């Protein structure tokens, strides 16, 4: 029986998940888990990429010890961050995190040289201050001159494992430098940030085979035989592939550190409404586009849990939140102040004081403020999607860690007036594995793969609670409009 391994690394943790098809169902095992996080070093928030690679090998050793002698492997991580590689094939610095404050005003600075309209028309990508375009705009110019290749994080990991350098196109689209329709880097934008297309490896689609690990690794670690496949390397792209897609007019919410809400299209949408609402057209796998908005996610809850010294589990925090009345305060969760504050609890409380609202004090009140306002923000975005697409979204498929937060899922269903299907929580790893299975010929296509997902995992169904919170979305929208002036 073939074994497939998903290396799935997020901003706060990583894991190696092993998947196999048994009697038409996908069985998953977590083989290794490890922490992740940036650290302040040499004046910037940076990722320890060498540590992440070492953890991958530790996981592969566990897989070998468990009796798996030959596996397929795919890698996905968060988007936008990159590694600068010199002519000797080594990294020039530890990669800087998208949460680093160096790009806080970069959109305003760069768009004095090239218009927002040009950038959006060319790339179709949402304006976010941490996009690769703005990171490179702030990059050390002397370092860029020494750079032979600019590699996105998962491409760099694949390069270290196999010695083969590629640029996977779905993740490349998140840079805000890839032309929307041609699928090539836009030379005008590259020039504005002092790089050239030669500094990127060949663009490839998900499903491209990189091949075996470098022989050197087998002398250092006890490893199975590994065949590396380039999957949809942005974790959200993999998560969408791993979404069951219930409903006729469906949308998805990949709910993790970030929330990514949108729908899947065959043709990109970069018209006036999409530009006004700052929606993105990221490339997906197999000729699709992920039309979505990247907004705040469970990062706020993760910070609060940490600031409470991890004395509560996430399920315990959700229980405490359930004892509190929702919508006691309105919060624009997408405000930049919540991206990387010194203390999230204090930042939420300060926001409520500044806006003249009830200040949450207890852990339950703070968590309810987060969950209820995330639900409001999701509902608000669904109403925008309705307007842009010209039809009512009737179903929201929630995948990722947030699919386990029943309280938030029910609030979202009720406020947005949509059916919510929650799960699987491991959609990213599942989508990663599904691309590998399609590449190997074990699954015919994504459509059949999604049917396998529906049959293999417990998907919870939430329906709107009629008559509850009927005015709260309109009130929240008024609050946001007033705040934005």
Task: Please annotate each region the language model reported.
Residues 1-93, 146, 218-228, 416-418, ...:
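N-terminal glycine/serine-rich phosphate-binding loop of ATP-dependent small-molecule kinases
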Residues 131-137:
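A charged, well-structured terminal subsegment
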Residues 76-81, 206, 255-258, 395-403:
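Glycine-rich beta-strand-to-loop/alpha-helix junction loops that act as flexible
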Residues 69-77, 149, 202, 391-400:
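Short glycine-rich phosphate-binding loop at a beta-alpha junction
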Residues 6, 18, 111-123, 137-152, ...:
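Active-site core segments that coordinate phosphate-bearing ligands/cofactors
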Residues 51-64, 182-188, 377-384:
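Short, well-ordered amphipathic alpha-helical segments that serve as non-catalytic structural scaffolds
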Residues 100:
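Carbohydrate-associated surface elements
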Residues 41, 61-97, 126-130, 158-179, ...:
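Short beta-strand-loop/turn "lid" adjacent to the catalytic site in phosphate-handling enzymes
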């Amino acid at each position: 029986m073939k074994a497939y391994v998903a290396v799935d690394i997020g901003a706060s943790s990583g894991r190696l998940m092993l998947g196999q098809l048994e009697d038409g169902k996908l069985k998953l095992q977590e083989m290794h888990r490890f922490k992740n996080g940036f650290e302040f070093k040499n004046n910037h928030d940076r990722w320890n990429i060498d540590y992440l690679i070492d953890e991958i090998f530790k996981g592969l050793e566990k897989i070998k010890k468990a009796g798996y002698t030959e596996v397929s492997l795919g890698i996905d991580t968060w988007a936008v961050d990159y590694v600068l590689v010199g002519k000797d094939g080594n990294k020039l610095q530890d990669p800087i995190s998208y949460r680093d404050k160096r790009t806080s005003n970069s959109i305003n600075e760069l768009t004095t040289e090239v218009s927002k309209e040009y950038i959006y028309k060319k790339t179709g990508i949402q304006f976010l201050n941490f996009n690769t375009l703005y990171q490179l705009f702030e990059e050390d110019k002397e370092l860029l001159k020494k750079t032979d290749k600019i590699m996105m994080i998962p491409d760099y990991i694949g390069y270290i494992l196999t010695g083969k350098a590629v640029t996977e196109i779905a993740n490349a689209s998140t840079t805000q430098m890839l032309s929307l329709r041609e699928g090539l880097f836009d030379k005008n934008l590259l020039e504005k940030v002092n790089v050239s297309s030669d500094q990127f490896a060949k663009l490839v689609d998900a499903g491209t085979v990189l091949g075996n690990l470098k022989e050197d690794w087998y002398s250092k670690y006890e490893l199975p035989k590994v065949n590396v496949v380039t999957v949809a390397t942005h974790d959200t792209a993999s998560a969408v592939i791993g979404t069951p897609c219930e409903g006729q007019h469906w949308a998805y919410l990949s709910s993790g550190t970030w929330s990514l809400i949108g729908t899947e299209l065959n043709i990109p949408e970069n018209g006036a409404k999409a530009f006004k609402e700052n929606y993105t057209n990221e490339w997906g796998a197999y000729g699709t586009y992920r039309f979505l908005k990247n907004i705040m996610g469970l990062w706020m809850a993760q910070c609060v849990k940490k600031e409470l010294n991890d004395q509560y589990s996430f399920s315990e925090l959700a229980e405490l939140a359930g004892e509190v009345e929702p919508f006691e305060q309105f919060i624009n969760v997408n405000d930049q102040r919540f991206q990387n504050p010194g203390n999230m609890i204090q930042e939420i409380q300060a926001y409520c004081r500044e806006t003249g609202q009830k200040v949450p004090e207890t852990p339950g009140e703070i968590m309810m403020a987060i969950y209820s306002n995330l639900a409001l923000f999701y509902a608000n975005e669904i109403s925008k999607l309705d307007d842009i697409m010209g039809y009512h979204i009737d179903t929201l498929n929630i995948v990722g860690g947030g699919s386990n937060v029943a309280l938030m899922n029910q609030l979202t269903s009720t406020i947005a007036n949509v059916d919510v299907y929650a799960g699987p929580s491991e959609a990213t790893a599942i989508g990663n594995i599904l691309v590998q299975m399609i590449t190997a010929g074990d699954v015919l296509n994504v459509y059949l793969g999604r049917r396998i997902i529906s049959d293999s995992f417990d998907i919870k169904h939430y329906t709107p609670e009629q008559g509850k919170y009927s005015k709260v979305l309109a009130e929240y929208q008024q609050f946001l409009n007033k705040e934005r002036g």
